């Protein structure tokens, strides 16, 4: 009973001291309030709150942990003003991560505290007071700020290029009606998910990275934007999975699917990613409710990354099985259609490892300043240039798209040439019109058959319905 009373009294004393300390800070702020900007006051308040919370938790830990039962000299557990230190054997240098109280402190660096051989904490010779070595916390701050700024601009440029290339690709798909088919519809949804993700990423980075006061106040809107970002990131990968499932159904089980129902793809691509995003939001608010949910130092991110990795693995399995079937068909029948499908599969097969490698590298962040910097640059390129990569492979390198663009470009050149010839008066109007009509018809037929072997998007989807099951 006496022990409980003493513990409660000690807690009360700690709380009173903290409150008195806080009152002194508030009075000092009121005296100088007219001179200090609001953003700095908010930041200082957040820093003090973190320190006082850590101080209270440290005193709780000091009281509740059992006494050190080891033999020999040791340094007693203590609070040094910023960090909590446990019992340390004599002659040992204890270390832990730097705190994140201040903007110029790097939490990835280490703080050290030396326990002397006599069982007393090291005292600094200048002040003769116990001393903790925090010097490494801001030794490389300037270099890391430069790196962070470079990564910020790299990210913004990557998403800007992604948005531009994806919008151009969507314009091509919507403008040229002869490209319309179910596979292109899946491409459109995939591209749109990447556009939305890039837009929300740029908005979030512009608002958060340049506004520490916003992060300090921790508004709900900040967390909502992070929730939307994680949801859209999931949509990117599940629409990639839809691409793989569609091709697998079309090529491997085409006998059972004359026309696929896209509603299931919409549910998988737009609906399913809501589940892990909502679970992550609830778990984050309960177990790791950091400001704006921007920290990556939590295993709760695997709630998002786990389903994405599963989608990538399933997609890879489907694509490898498709390649097996196509190779079998090529060996037996030497069909030209199999070559066309192989080109379509090859694009997806290239993208899946490129989009998934970031999740392979994510848990393996190396130690060391230079290695970490290289890792950060590689990860940012892999993560933030995905939209540009998707648009390039699925649209700009697409043979059908290139054939359509070339055909329309040739038509434009012919029409422009006819207008120029007409203005010069080189031919009569009737002769010019009839000649151009003949040339246009000839150009259209020759160019398209040469590029696509006489097959369009719908032909490619339907050709495998006619193949024999023995090659499956």
UniProtKB/Swiss-Prot annotation:
Residues 29-149, 209-219, 284-299, 362-376 are extracellular. Residues 1-28 form the signal peptide. Disulfide bonds join 58-84, 75-115, 98-137. It holds the Pfam family 7tm_2. It is a multi-pass membrane protein. GO terms for molecular function: calcitonin receptor activity. Keywords: Cell membrane, Disulfide bond, G-protein coupled receptor, Glycoprotein, Membrane, Receptor, Signal, Transducer, Transmembrane, Transmembrane helix. The keyword Aminoacyl-tRNA synthetase does not apply. GO terms for cellular component: plasma membrane. Residues 175-185, 249-262, 325-339, 398-472 are cytoplasmic. Glycans are attached at residues 76, 128, 133. The chain crosses the membrane at residues 150-174, 186-208, 220-248, 263-283, 300-324, 340-361, 377-397. PANTHER family: CALCITONIN GENE-RELATED PEPTIDE TYPE 1 RECEPTOR, PDF RECEPTOR-LIKE PROTEIN-RELATED. This is Calcitonin gene-related peptide type 1 receptor. It comes from Xenopus tropicalis (Western clawed frog). The gene is calcrl.
